[in-house]
Amino acid sequence: MKLRETIMKLVFLIAACCSVLAVALICIFLFMNGVPAIFKIGPLKFLTGTVWKPGNNIFGILPMIVGSICVTGLAILMGVSVAILTSVFLSRYCPKKFYGICKSGINLMAGIPSIVYGFFGLVVIVPLMAQLTGKNGNTMLTASILLAVMILPTVVGVTESAITSVPESYYEASLGLGATHSQSVFFAVVPAAKSGILAGIVLGIGRAIGETMAVIMIAGNQPRMPKGITEGLRTMTANIVLEMGYASGLHREALIATGVVLFVFILLINLSVSMLNRRVHYGD
């Protein structure tokens, strides 16, 4: 029995080490290949430059940084509110006979490939936006709407689990104080699940900022500063995918450096939310 436990501990340790090693190797590859390129180009020119012309050895990724932030921010604003309300409905309002149907539909959304979402956006959302704005439908707003739909399953899944895990005593105590069902849900249960909701939002941000295929199909892909939500743009992930296939030399290194910037962005978001979570816990 002890031998079996020792073997299982060793297996778990190896699995954990493999996971950590994979992340470490990715970090080493990115920073070894990307950071030197940033210093070759010049950190200020690379991060704040507004012109991307690889043919002229001009590599300014500020338009792609702004594009990624704007698209992700709009998607989160639109998607998170819908996701939280959906989670509340599923966990506290949805009749049992409809729960399975609703949950299956959301799970199905999570399994749809990005290319299918992109095709849907290209065929349905882009023409609709073109009619509404009188411009090309490949815009920031179009990409944000599609990303908001794409992050729903991720945020709903985590948020619903967080709301469901809140002890029933919170809800019952609120009812005992004279609150209605809705007041108890929104002012007692949901606030108690805020840590899980924040985790869901972080996962949603990660999904949105890292999405590539669907964004390439509908965002316009112009490497220039976006001037409004009805203008086209290019994100950092789209920039890497569109040009990595034929890039070489400093151009290729600049694309890897773009990946470094994206990695740092994700890291900063995770650290920020982690610190916010600690404040929430200390506040409780």
Locations of the language-model features?
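Transmembrane alpha-helix signature in integral membrane proteins
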Residues: 59-89
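C-terminal transmembrane helix and the adjacent membrane-cytosol boundary/short C-terminal tail
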Residues: 160-164, 168, 175, 242-284
